[in-house]
């Protein structure tokens, strides 16, 4: 299936080079389009030309690219337009070994297949405590009954620790059971002034320490912590104290947008509003997938089918921009006039 996807990418990108009818095509583009169009026309009985000039010819070439995109992604879009019918035989065109594919396309598909079939350490973009169900007021003393050290979450990436005079204790428990981190990068600081439960202000005196695995860590410096070694706090002073521990970032096996080059840009290209026809077409295609149909996914996609669909659909969007096809989509009423931000914004409501 990798070669089928690579051929689909190659052919669509070749079509995207047809910026004008009289352009001098590169030799490899002529070879790719010549073989692909001949095979496609023979199997589907369409009339795609290598140099589309009229609207009908541009539509035919775009429909060829749409067929290839859907076939490579394994999507059966169904009846979405009175002007277009998906040709399931296109998969046979893409399976033709005579159609060459570029090194770039092959490498990109190999990257998608390779990265989605395994896991690796990645810097996570969300706060470590993002999904906590409760939070505490920053800078306000809090102590549970029968305890001398209390650690609480006070933000999506922050905890604060209240310590009685002379108290010491481990606080790594508050990190455990969250996010399955491989490494957590922390910074700790003394809270110089904090509010007691009665509302009066109190100062944290110098001498409070935070240690990892028995080694004292300097305040205000990034600490690499594996989440397993003892994270110990100690208040040797004769007054209550508070410290703040911030998770600068953490590394885990969860997939991110860095698993594929320019995945963020590909997603933006897919979900951008070009006109109402593209908006309706993209929505209809993504309705047949697990991806959201109008707005980008909340979390990075982590399976091959989703990332491959985004890559192919982003390339189809470029072809749409170049060929400027005009056809109807069921349930879509195009609005005449120039594209404005207000029109684009209204399409997502």
UniProtKB/Swiss-Prot annotation:
Subunit and interaction comment:
Homotrimer that assemble in a complex of 260 capsomers on an inner scaffold composed of VP3.
As for what it does, the entry says: The VP7 protein is one of the five proteins (with VP1, VP3, VP4, and VP6) which form the inner capsid of the virus.
Give the UniProt family note.
Answer: Belongs to the orbivirus VP7 family.
- Give the species this sequence originates from: Bluetongue virus 2 (isolate USA) (BTV 2)
Name listed for the protein in its UniProt record: Core protein VP7
Q: Tell me if Cytoplasm is a UniProt keyword of this record.
A: no
Glycosylation sites noted in the Swiss-Prot or TrEMBL record: 287
What is a biological process (GO) this protein takes part in? fusion of virus membrane with host plasma membrane
* Xref: InterPro entries: Capsid_hemagglutn, Orbi_VP7_capsid, Orbi_VP7_capsid_C, Orbi_VP7_capsid_N, Virus_capsid_a-hlx_vir
Task: Tell me which GO cellular component terms the UniProt record holds.
Answer: viral envelope; viral outer capsid
Q: Which GO terms describe its molecular function?
A: host cell surface receptor binding; structural molecule activity
| Keyword field | Capsid protein, Glycoprotein, Outer capsid protein, Virion
Subcellular compartments:
Virion
Which Pfam families does the entry mention? Orbi_VP7
Q: Decide whether keyword Signal is in the record.
A: no
């Amino acid at each position: 299936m990798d070669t089928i996807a690579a051929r689909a990418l190659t052919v669509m990108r070749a079509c995207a080079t047809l910026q004008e009818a009289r352009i001098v095509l590169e030799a490899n583009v002529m070879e790719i389009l010549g073989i692909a169009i001949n095979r496609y026309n023979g199997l589907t009985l369409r009339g795609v030309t290598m140099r589309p000039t009229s609207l009908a010819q541009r539509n035919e070439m775009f429909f060829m690219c749409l067929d290839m995109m859907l076939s490579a992604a394994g999507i059966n879009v169904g009846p979405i337009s009175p002007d277009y019918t998906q040709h399931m035989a296109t998969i046979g065109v893409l399976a033709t070994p005579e159609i060459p594919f570029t090194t770039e396309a092959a490498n990109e598909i190999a990257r998608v297949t390779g990265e989605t079939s395994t896991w690796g350490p990645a810097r996570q973009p969300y706060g470590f405590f993002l999904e906590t169900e409760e939070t505490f007021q920053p800078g306000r003393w809090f102590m549970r009954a029968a305890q001398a050290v209390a650690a609480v979450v006070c933000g999506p990436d922050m905890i604060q620790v209240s310590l009685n005079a002379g108290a010491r204790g481990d606080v790594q428990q508050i990190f455990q059971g969250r996010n399955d981190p491989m490494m957590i990068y922390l910074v700790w600081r003394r809270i110089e002034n904090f509010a007691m439960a009665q509302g009066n202000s109190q100062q944290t005196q110098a001498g409070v320490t935070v240690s990892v695995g028995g080694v004292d860590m300097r305040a205000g410096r990034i600490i690499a912590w594996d989440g397993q070694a003892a994270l110990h706090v100690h208040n040797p002073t004769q007054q209550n104290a508070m410290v703040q521990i911030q998770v600068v970032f953490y590394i885990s096996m969860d997939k991110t947008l860095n698993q594929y080059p320019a995945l963020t840009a590909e997603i933006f290209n897919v979900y951008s509003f070009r006109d109402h026809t593209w908006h309706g077409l993209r929505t209809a295609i993504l309705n047949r997938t697990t991806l959201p149909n109008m707005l980008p996914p909340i979390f990075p996609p982590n399976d091959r089918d989703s990332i491959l669909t985004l890559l192919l659909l982003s390339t189809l969007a470029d072809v749409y921009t170049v060929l400027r096809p005009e056809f109807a989509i069921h349930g879509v009423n195009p609005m005449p006039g120039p594209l404005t931000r207000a029109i684009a914004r209204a399409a997502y409501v």
